[in-house]
Amino acid sequence: MRRYHRPMARARRIACSLLTACVAIAGLASPAWAHTSATPVATQPAWMRAITTAIGNRPVSVAIGKDGDPWYGHLGWVGRPPASNEKLLLSMALLQRYRPWRTIRTNASATSKPGSRGVVYGNLWIMGHGDPGIDGTRIGVLGRAIRDAGVRHIRGSVIGNTGPFVRDWWARGWKDYFPADYIPLPTALTYRENTDRRGVHITDPELLAAKKLTARLRHLGITVGHKPGMGHAPTGLHPIAQIVSPPLQDLIRRMDLRSRNFWAEVLGKYLGADEWGRGTIANGARAIDRFTDAHGQDFTIYDSSGLSYANRANARGILELLWNADGAPWGPILRAALPSGGRGTLEDRLTDVRIRAKTGTLDDASALSGWVWLERTGGWVEFSILSSGFNEWTAKKIEDRIVRIVSFRATPPP
């Protein structure tokens, strides 16, 4: 992940402005796809010319290819905000590091094991480790596991641990209203996606989890001496009971299907804690950046959800990462995790196309990257479309047009 001192950053902004202006002028003066397309204009098939026509002079980057062979490119090297295509990169980084059946545990722990009479002397701590899907049902399962472990009396309180993740709630490039409107506080111990019953983002999910577990334990006949709370757990605790999340591949699918920002930042902190020692938004971004760097992509990444307007990726780089995924053991798992036409964030789009792709939307920025099926010859082909600087709804119409052209008309170039 790149960082700049102020003089260097100012110089870079000036240089980028000049480069952008040159790109815009060049785009008007000559066919933009000529910069990256593997097929010369004179021999381009009709489907490629149709894509170029659909784009027009708008600032849209397109990269299409299969198995390491680039078929079509249009400004594929230009950096743009990937929006929620960042979650696609996070998904790749997670699947590269962990096995798809990995689970994330949530423990109930205390300073000592319960005695022969089932007494826990002191507090019972709920220890979260980054499962974004804890809710009342899962807390109920934890309560029964505590009972089955022989606990009958808790002399202290049930307390939700506020560690081990750092409680940061900001990334460079976020708008000031994002924490209130788009991303709840990402914590290690979550509860109901860290919102209250009205959907308002809260700052004490650990307390709500502790209250819920206290109520469930009492319902199960376990006495609890004091009211629930939240705080930083002491060291040296002994696990008494635990629950585990669904497999990682299921967590990724739930995140990508509806493009859940909260899930992305929690899983990003989980990955960041493993790779950099502390669960922060910045370290989650650094972990994704490490993955993309290792595969030759010089992206700029500040979060895991893609909310940051300062993030930069390019269509050609995403295409190459999709090629890498195709050759990885986890490639089919990633493809299956992405929305199909008419499902998730594609619920009103591309119902007539066989597609698996990740969407992305910010104000004046849009993205769609993944796999589309070739109806003429069969087989999946990878693609990435990024746009910026104009209305995202217009951009999505262009995306859909391009995908349909590829699906129904494209064949491998000669």
Predicted segments with their positions:
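Secretory targeting and sorting signals
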Residues: R2-H35
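Beta-lactamase-like hydrolase cores
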Residues: C22-I25, A32-P81, P100-W101, R105, ...
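Small-residue-rich helix-loop
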Residues: W71-G73, G272-P414
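Active-site-adjacent, His/Asp/Glu-enriched structural segments that form or flank metal-binding
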Residues: I104-F165, P179-A180, T190-Y191
